[in-house]
Amino acid sequence: MPQPFFVLQKTLAGLRNGLLYHLENQFGICQQGEKPTRQKNSLPSALKKRKHCRPLRSQSNEKSVCRAIRKTKVCFLHEKDRVQSSFGLASLIEHNHL
């Protein structure tokens, strides 16, 4: 794994909830059947253009699991794929999403 990612992971260690979701999605980490989309929200300007994942239109009939996080929603197609904020990037690495 590249060294800059370790530095970034250490930097993010203290961040929680919505901010961590936004930073995870900045890397384009979307579940299968989803694509990144840009959303404007009330977060600080540095985070306003972060990528978020949403179901593809062709699979819009799939049941999505959404969790509202500070006026933003991060949607996953299946409950088991939802990443809890307490695990963050470490969970993604552990489950081989990176």
From Swiss-Prot:
> What does its record list under induction?
Expression is sigma A-dependent.
Instruction: Choose any GO biological process term that the UniProt entry carries and state it.
Output: sporulation resulting in formation of a cellular spore
- In which domain of life is the source organism classified? Bacteria
This protein's UniProt keywords: Sporulation
Q: Where is this region: Disordered?
A: 33-64
Q: Further remark, if any? A: Entirely encoded within the dnaG gene, on the opposite strand.
Name the UniProt record assigns to this protein:
Protein AntE
Q: Which organism is it from?
A: Bacillus subtilis (strain 168)
Name the lineage.
Bacteria, Bacillati, Bacillota, Bacilli, Bacillales
Q: Which gene encodes it?
A: antE
